[in-house]
C-alpha cells in the first residue's frame, strides 16, 4: 500500500526530517493505517490551550486519544500547583503532520464521524473510533511553532521574509 504524507497548513515550517521520519514509521508499522508526530509540551500555557492538540499514547507508541483539553490530567500534581507543568508525566503536543496508507484514505470518507470527533473538531478521532491504529512518532528535536494565532502568523511571515 502506498503512503501519502499531509502537512497541515498551520505547520508551514515543518522540517523535512520530521516528514521523512513519520512516513518511515508508517512503512515500518503495517498494523497502522496512519502515522503522525508529536513532541513534548514545554509550557503550561500550551497544556491548557485548546489550540494545542494533545495526544496520549499506549505502550506501543500508538495514539489512545487526541484532545484539545489538557491530557493526561495529573490530578494530584495539579491539586498542589497549576502554574507549572508537573514532572514525571509525558505531556505531548500533537503536530499537524500525517502519513496515510492510500487504502485507508480511500476508506476514510465512508466512515461515519465519531461523536468525540465532532465535539473536539479533530478528524483523526474518526480513525480511532473505527478501530484503526495511529502510530505516533515522538520527535526530540526543537521544532518551529505552528500557526494558531495572529501572532504566530506574523512570526512565520517574518521567518519567510528573512529567507528571501
Each language-model region and where it sits:
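Short, high-confidence coil segments that cap the C-terminus of an alpha-helix
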Residues: 1, 29-32, 132
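Short active-site-adjacent helix-start/loop capping segments
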Residues: 13-15, 145-146
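Short acidic donor-binding/metal-coordinating loop in glycosyltransferase active sites
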Residues: 9-11
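Short aromatic/hydrophobic "clamp" motif used to bind/position activated sugar donors
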Residues: 4-6
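Conserved alpha/beta core of the MobA/IspD/sugar-nucleotide pyrophosphorylase nucleotidyltransferase superfamily
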Residues: 80-164
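Residue-level signal for threonine
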Residues: 1, 42-43, 149
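Conserved core of the sugar-phosphate nucleotidyltransferase
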Residues: 14-114
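Proteins with a high burden of low-complexity, intrinsically disordered sequence enriched in S/T/G/P/A and R
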Residues: 1-2, 120
Amino acid at each position: 500500500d502506498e503512503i501519502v504524507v499531509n502537512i497541515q497548513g498551520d505547520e508551514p515550517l515543518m522540517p523535512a526530517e520530521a516528514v521523512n521520519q513519520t512516513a518511515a514509521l508508517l512503512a515500518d508499522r503495517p498494523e497502522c493505517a496512519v502515522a503522525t508526530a508529536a513532541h513534548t509540551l514545554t509550557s503550561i500555557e500550551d497544556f491548557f490551550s485548546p489550540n494545542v492538540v494533545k495526544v496520549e499514547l499506549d505502550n506501543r507508541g500508538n495514539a489512545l486519544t487526541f484532545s484539545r483539553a489538557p491530557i493526561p490530567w495529573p490530578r494530584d500534581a495539579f491539586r498542589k500547583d497549576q502554574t507549572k507543568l508537573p514532572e514525571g508525566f509525558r505531556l505531548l503536543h500533537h503536530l499537524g503532520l500525517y502519513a496515510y496508507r492510500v487504502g485507508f484514505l480511500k476508506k476514510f470518507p465512508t466512515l461515519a464521524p465519531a461523536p468525540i470527533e465532532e465535539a473536539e473538531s479533530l478528524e483523526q478521532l474518526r480513525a480511532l473510533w473505527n478501530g484503526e491504529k495511529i502510530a505516533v512518532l515522538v520527535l526530540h528535536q526543537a521544532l518551529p511553532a505552528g500557526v494558531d494565532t495572529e501572532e504566530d502568523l506574523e512570526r512565520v511571515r517574518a521567518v519567510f521574509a528573512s529567507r528571501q
